[in-house]
Amino acid sequence: MMCQKFYVVLLHWEFLYVIAALNLAYPISPWKFKLFCGPPNTTDDSFLSPAGAPNNASALKGASEAIVEAKFNSSGIYVPELSKTVFHCCFGNEQGQNCSALTDNTEGKTLASVVKASVFRQLGVNWDIECWMKGDLTLFICHMEPLPKNPFKNYDSKVHLLYDLPEVIDDSPLPPLKDSFQTVQCNCSLRGCECHVPVPRAKLNYALLMYLEITSAGVSFQSPLMSLQPMLVVKPDPPLGLHMEVTDDGNLKISWDSQTMAPFPLQYQVKYLENSTIVREAAEIVSATSLLVDSVLPGSSYEVQVRSKRLDGSGVWSDWSSPQVFTTQDVVYFPPKILTSVGSNASFHCIYKNENQIISSKQIVWWRNLAEKIPEIQYSIVSDRVSKVTFSNLKATRPRGKFTYDAVYCCNEQACHHRYAELYVIDVNINISCETDGYLTKMTCRWSPSTIQSLVGSTVQLRYHRRSLYCPDSPSIHPTSEPKNCVLQRDGFYECVFQPIFLLSGYTMWIRINHSLGSLDSPPTCVLPDSVVKPLPPSNVKAEITVNTGLLKVSWEKPVFPENNLQFQIRYGLSGKEIQWKTHEVFDAKSKSASLLVSDLCAVYVVQVRCRRLDGLGYWSNWSSPAYTLVMDVKVPMRGPEFWRKMDGDVTKKERNVTLLWKPLTKNDSLCSVRRYVVKHRTAHNGTWSEDVGNRTNLTFLWTEPAHTVTVLAVNSLGASLVNFNLTFSWPMSKVSAVESLSAYPLSSSCVILSWTLSPDDYSLLYLVIEWKILNEDDGMKWLRIPSNVKKFYIHDNFIPIEKYQFSLYPVFMEGVGKPKIINGFTKDAIDKQQNDAGLYVIVPIIISSCVLLLGTLLISHQRMKKLFWDDVPNPKNCSWAQGLNFQKPETFEHLFTKHAESVIFGPLLLEPEPISEEISVDTAWKNKDEMVPAAMVSLLLTTPDPESSSICISDQCNSANFSGSQSTQVTCEDECQRQPSVKYATLVSNDKLVETDEEQGFIHSPVSNCISSNHSPLRQSFSSSSWETEAQTFFLLSDQQPTMISPQLSFSGLDELLELEGSFPEENHREKSVCYLGVTSVNRRESGVLLTGEAGILCTFPAQCLFSDIRILQERCSHFVENNLSLGTSGENFVPYMPQFQTCSTHSHKIMENKMCDLTV
């Protein structure tokens, strides 16, 4: 049997560097790329010969070549096989096209791998590589997977990643040396290999150079050089907290938590699968942390995943988050449950699906408990599919068996689904709380009536029943109870005091609400005074910070009452206006002190203690009086102060004055005070010595040695600081320049940013010190100590824009202080920008001044604008009729806007052009006593005669009337009368001889007939030969001298005699009388015209239905229309029957006239 032994085929793949520039590195994309290596006959020429590379192998003769030997040992015979083949490795797509190799076209040199082997004559070696920066920006990861046709196995492969990360950013760096690359071992598994490269956060924007070395089955491969920027290939972590909910609008809201660790904004890609009546898959990219999916459908399921990426498009998409599934029911209620209180409002939304069909919101009806249909006025249509119902002023839910909620159903017009929403409405009962004082002498009970519904006319009262011992298991309202007087306090609570009390007796209490409709009792509660004790607070409370241990020690003494075991609670905090309290529990009843760990040992703490029964019954006592700690040293200072120096003297001389400056230690560093500072000096020749500077924060000494080291110590009452800062002054180190550049940019008057670059050196940089001051001023220098790895720093100070500042940056090494970089003023670009922005400071004041000027102009022209747009309201005091009126009295305005208090004279009213005739007759006596008229009568003819019936129709009422007298005549009238335009006439008749008869008769109320027939009336005969026949005839009666209202009683015979009087009026023996006028109105205003005015200002209207019906005039309140002994003269010159006059009446007379007099309107 022959055994064959295979020797390992060794492939050495050497990388050829073109030493032209660093741009030979291949810039990889921030996503997946592929590495192809293969013999010439496996791919086309484009794969084997990159752009700019020659196709023949003779161009590579100058390169060093590795020999691959395949050795077979068969039966102890060594058989070597040699063949030479040139292999190329490049990056490209899966088909091997557009394969890139790095060449230098100017010199014709190619970066390639030269390989001699016959084992890869037919197959190439290909890998799939992906690189990214981890989301927390701490680790750079490259993942490599072999393609399916790769002949090597991962488990037999060893992969190393070699990388170089420069120290500084430079546009034209030198080519990297091979020895400068660092090696990282990659972890390989069956699926692939993964390499981890740690990248400092400060170098994320630097160019990272790297390449891969792969060893498998004894064969080594080396990839081309790759270049990338870690910040551009960041792969964030998948979003967390993915959840979904249905909004009030019926949309599905997908939300997730934002990644707060990412230093840049992110975009998110949401992938969801909707499975409802149709299957829909969508992916959307958003910048917010939520996404609304329109029109959520009932009976659907949504599977959602989210991933993130940098918002600017660079970087790598994160992995998808874990899928979340959200399923909706056939009927969707949102929200499905509501818990609310009495009197509030609540709304439900619903989407109804029936047999794979969405019901329109217009067809949805709502039911409560499937027994009460909710009125449609409470419905609202949110969208075509979403319906809303609103409950206003909710009442308490009535329990139905075990159901303590109302079931709200969203139904179709034909049927309801079994799913429902739940509505909980809670009514809070009246809570009675009682507490017994610390001396165990009285019990105070409090309760609030706010939970009682507003009930008009109700009263509240506390009633109680005392049981001899303890409380019953279930307290109930006792039939014999006593009321307790309670007093309403300012806080709205009622307070009742029970004194004396029985500690072990049970007091059952309840609130009774008394109302006229009945009384209501709140649920009773039983109180045991011994179980509601509020103890007295602990006394003699002390607090202190212990020395060396640094603990807050609190001690107290327990109260005398009660005698039960007590637990204690301590609260403590930093003393100030707003104390942030912390609490500590002490359950040991015998304990009288406690020690607490505090963070600030040098602060003043305020401490209080309270107690309660250990078994939990009763209340906490009030807090004790506060106790305060004293600030004292508890430990030696934690460290010495940070310090810096200021140099004086000539820099060329060997002796210079050095002034040390340091900042006082804080309490937390000094623990808790500093009594003095000590400066230690160390030199090579003079040894070591110390100086005590007391509480000063500076010290000046003479620097004469080549190297002088100083240390500043802080000393308190317990000793000196253990950790201190050293500063070495060295002449050789003062010439070391480590700062290449320094720039200062003003951001505002209170902030300046400094940026710098450092040059590499052989010294160990400890930290940097920034100095700044006003240029050409020795005083006012300020300084800051910053870490050595910082490249820029924000200085916050009060910078004066017109001043020039000097900025200095000192590198501090272990060996001493290096040479500073000093700049005078800000960087030129920043100054130009400020000068360009100076125009803004000029434009803004101009705009503000213009606005102020415009506002002033508007205020000055306010009166003109007011007259232009609004009419000027006249001042009543400038009117003649308002002279002498006091507008401060309310009565003035009452008379002013209702009726004038005095007569207002108008000119004569112009009559319409119509024929006028008048006749005045005065009769002194009646023919017989029975026919006498007990009052003066004035006839006013206002109607038109009916040519057919020869009658006069006065009113719409057709009733016959008897004129009281010796004779009576039956009068008939027509129902309707045709009225024609006419002029009003009046006849004035006075009889002073009938006064006594009038007084004897008294007040007679006998209405005159509403209609007078011309066929039986003696008036027609009396007026047959006069001008009255041509006009309409109506009678108007006025009382004569009677203090009361008189309705005359007439007969036609007496009226006939009255009209036959043609005598003269006597003028002597009569005093002047006032006259009452009749108003004349247009015939077109017959229904509402004014007919009668008087001296007292009576303005009356005469409706047709009231003509000759109960006509009265108040004689003593208005002017006498006809006096008893009226004398107008025989000629009648002095009597003017028509003088239209509009006058006013007093308020009192006006009211009487309105109440007791009929309107006189035709």
Swiss-Prot record:
Q: What is the effect of changing residue 600 to N?
A: In strain: KK Obese
Mapped to this chain, the residue ranges on the Cytoplasmic side of the membrane are: 861-1162
Sequence positions bearing Phosphotyrosine: 985, 1077, 1138
UniProt region (Leptin-binding), positions on chain? 465-482
Q: Name one GO biological process term.
A: cholesterol metabolic process
Taxonomic lineage: Eukaryota, Metazoa, Chordata, Craniata, Vertebrata
Q: In which tissues is it expressed?
A: Isoform A: highest level of expression in lung and kidney, also present in heart, brain, spleen, liver, muscle, choroid plexus and hypothalamus. Isoform B: highest levels of expression in hypothalamus and lower levels in brain, testes and adipose tissue. Expressed by neurons of the parabrachial nucleus. Expressed by peripheral blood mononuclear cells and CD4(+) T-cells. Isoform E: expressed in adipose tissue, liver, hypothalamus, cerebral microvessels, heart, and testes.
The record's subcellular locations are: Cell membrane; Basolateral cell membrane
Query: Mutating residue 902 to A has which effect?
Result: No effect on STAT3 phosphorylation
The UniProt entry, under Pfam families, shows: fn3 (PF00041), Lep_receptor_Ig (PF06328), ObR_Ig (PF18589)
Protein family membership = Belongs to the type I cytokine receptor family. Type 2 subfamily.
**An example Gene Ontology CC term for this record:** plasma membrane
Cystine links in this protein are 37-90, 89-99, 131-142, 186-195, 188-193, 350-410, 411-416, 434-445, 471-526, 486-496
Q: Which GO terms describe its molecular function?
A: leptin receptor activity; peptide hormone binding; transmembrane signaling receptor activity
* Record protein name field: Leptin receptor
Signal peptide boundaries: 1-21
Q: Give ranges for the Extracellular compartment.
A: 22-839
Phenotype reported upon loss of the gene: Mutants are hyperphagic, obese, infertile, diabetic and have impaired growth. Have wet brain weight significantly lower than controls. Brain uptake of leptin is also reduced. Animals have an increased bone formation leading to high bone mass. Have impaired T-cell immunity, Th2 responses are favoured in mutants. Conditional knockout in parabrachial nucleus CCK-expressing neurons, treated with 2-deoxyglucose, have increased levels of glucagon, corticosterone and epinephrin concentrations compared to wild-types.
* Motif WSXWS motif location, chain numbering: 620-624
Q: CDD domains, alphabetically?
A: FN3
Quaternary arrangement and interactors, per the entry? Answer: Present as a mixture of monomers and dimers. The phosphorylated receptor binds a number of SH2 domain-containing proteins such as JAK2, STAT3, PTPN11, and SOCS3. Interaction with SOCS3 inhibits JAK/STAT signaling and MAPK cascade.
**Where do the Fibronectin type-III domain residues begin and end?**
238-331, 537-632, 637-729, 738-832
Q: Where is this motif: Box 1 motif?
A: 869-877
Function summary: Receptor for hormone LEP/leptin. On ligand binding, mediates LEP central and peripheral effects through the activation of different signaling pathways such as JAK2/STAT3 and MAPK cascade/FOS. In the hypothalamus, LEP acts as an appetite-regulating factor that induces a decrease in food intake and an increase in energy consumption by inducing anorexinogenic factors and suppressing orexigenic neuropeptides, also regulates bone mass and secretion of hypothalamo-pituitary-adrenal hormones.
In its UniProt entry, the species of origin is given as Mus musculus (Mouse)
Residue ranges of the region described as Required for STAT3 phosphorylation = 896-904
Q: How does the protein's chain sit in the membrane according to the entry?
A: Single-pass type I membrane protein
